[in-house]
């Protein structure tokens, strides 16, 4: 079982890391993307830390992470922010980050996979 990023690293470690990231890459947003706890059988993502441009949309982010998850074309990928909010694909990452950023400086996104053909 893969530990969640919040459990694997202390708050201080995460805060220190995002502070450095924001200093070095002011035009990027630090994001952690992990599978939802409810998706026991879903494949793990091969990379969970991302630095995305502020002008990226959720749809573009989905397009960029889909190859990093071993799913078939008949499976839909859904993202949840703050484990409760499903943003529209046209939502801007900067706005989502500003609204839902954790105190440690990361935006935490979880993904769920659903079969589109039953």
Regions inferred by a protein language model and the residue ranges of each:
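Ubiquitin system architectures
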Residues: 1-118
């Amino acid at each position: 079982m893969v530990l969640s990023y919040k459990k694997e690293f202390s708050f201080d470690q995460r805060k220190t890391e995002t502070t450095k990231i924001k200093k070095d890459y002011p035009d990027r947003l630090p994001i952690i993307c992990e599978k939802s706890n409810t998706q026991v059988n879903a494949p793990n993502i091969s990379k969970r830390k991302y630095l995305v441009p502020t002008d990226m949309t959720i749809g573009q982010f989905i397009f960029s992470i889909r190859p990093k998850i071993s799913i078939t074309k008949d499976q839909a990928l859904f993202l949840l922010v703050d484990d409760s909010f499903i943003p529209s694909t046209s939502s801007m990452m900067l706005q989502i980050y500003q609204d839902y950023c954790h105190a440690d400086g990361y935006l935490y996104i979880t993904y769920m996979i659903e079969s589109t053909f039953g």
